[in-house]
Amino acid sequence: MGYYSLTEVTAVQYAKEHGYFEKKANVVCHEIGDGNLNYVFKLDDGVKSIIIKQALPYAKVVGESWPLSIKRATIESKALQIFAKYVPEYVPVVYSHDEELAVTVIEDLSRLTITRKGLIDGEEYPLLSQHIGRFLANVLFYTSDFGLQSEEKRVLEGTFVNPDLCKITEDLVFTDPFGHYDTNDYESELQLAVDELWSDKILKLKVAQYKYKFLTRKEALIHGDLHTGSIFSSPSETKVIDPEFATYGPFGFDIGQFIANLLLNALSREEEQRGVLFFHIEKTWSYFVETFTKLWIGEGVEAYTKEKQWLPIILQNIFTDAVGFAGCELIRRTIGLAHVADLEEITNKETRIQAKKQAISLGKELIKYESKNADIQLFRTLFQQTVSGGIKA
């Protein structure tokens, strides 16, 4: 039959045909997706529920003028299964994948909240940083040359060649926000800050280097889009979702993106409410280092993991990259194509513009920063130096 786009009606038919519900079951189905690239259906018969996710052959955020390969759904399904091999507690269960229809049937996580929404609403997730730090350490270590035999790594790397979505990252994170491109989207009040950004040749040279790292450093399997909208949370659980951007890339990329999105939330808060975000930034890194170090010592398969002075160099490189990638993410989420609710939902326009100017300034500082040691306090320090006072909604 070939590919066709599901509707709420045909999603139920699909689920019944594939044995997820009885033929006579009264299944309620709603399209709940709020992302840019897919349909997401929740199906519930009152006894059990599932999620059906279907990749569209174009970007929803733009329309059919921006075609995309539906093979990204297979990438996403395989990435979730790889993650589950090492950290099953931090990802949803994948029940099945249909490559022809680009459909993946996965666990319903409705008991949890999208982390971005929860943070905006003031919810607290005390284990978020512990879980994300451990998730990243395990996935990055075990899919790298340090935790995987080189032959196996090369085969796995070939599985995650993801040209369409990598091109989106190349353009929307590293290129378009730093020049005159039609994809950019920002208020006129930001024009002066944007002009200064675009004319900063030192900054653009640094961005070029980070883009080159993304293009060439195939260090480990990365999620590729690890923002707070790609994580479900509760006070006791954390689940990473939506790895359709998964590819082999730099160790520091996911760490930087996650930290940047915590910083964006911090920018939306009054000063006295920001401490929890810096707690999570700092604990994410400390749990990452602790877990990665244990794996390096106990599970390392590469000969030079026995050299004690090698690990600190690797961790320093990861940190340096994470700082720069975080800066790029801050700027793209402020003036690029895909904005974030953390800033967009600040109701007072003057305050919202102020927060966006601060995001641009902080992003520039992070990109330009020359880190000589992996001091996670750097994010708090640069934030305090760049941002004065609190945000008043």
UniProtKB/Swiss-Prot annotation:
Keywords: Amino-acid biosynthesis, ATP-binding, Kinase, Methionine biosynthesis, Nucleotide-binding, Transferase
Residues that hold ATP according to the record: N38, K53, E107, D108, L109, D242, P243, E244
Chain positions recorded as substrate binding sites: D225, R332
InterPro entries associated with the record: Aminoglycoside_PTrfase, Kinase-like_dom_sf, Methylthioribose_kinase
EC supergroup of this enzyme: transferase
SUPFAM superfamilies in the cross-refs: Protein kinase-like (PK-like) (SSF56112)
Nucleotide-binding in keyword set: yes
EC assignment: 2.7.1.100
Catalysed reactions, as listed in the record: 5-(methylsulfanyl)-D-ribose + ATP = 5-(methylsulfanyl)-alpha-D-ribose 1-phosphate + ADP + H(+)
Highest taxon listed in the record's lineage: Bacteria
Gene Ontology MF annotations: ATP binding; S-methyl-5-thioribose kinase activity
Biological processes, Gene Ontology terms: L-methionine salvage from methylthioadenosine
A Pfam family reported for this protein in Swiss-Prot or TrEMBL: APH
Annotated Gene3D superfamilies: 3.90.1200.10, Phosphorylase Kinase, domain 1
Involved pathway(s): Amino-acid biosynthesis; L-methionine biosynthesis via salvage pathway; S-methyl-5-thio-alpha-D-ribose 1-phosphate from S-methyl-5'-thioadenosine (hydrolase route): step 2/2
Subunit structure: Homodimer.
NCBIfam families: MTRK
PANTHER family in UniProt: METHYLTHIORIBOSE KINASE (PTHR34273:SF2)
Similarity comment: Belongs to the methylthioribose kinase family.
Task performed by this protein: Catalyzes the phosphorylation of methylthioribose into methylthioribose-1-phosphate.
Protein name per its UniProtKB record: Methylthioribose kinase
Organism listed in the record: Bacillus thuringiensis subsp. konkukian (strain 97-27)
Gene of this entry: mtnK
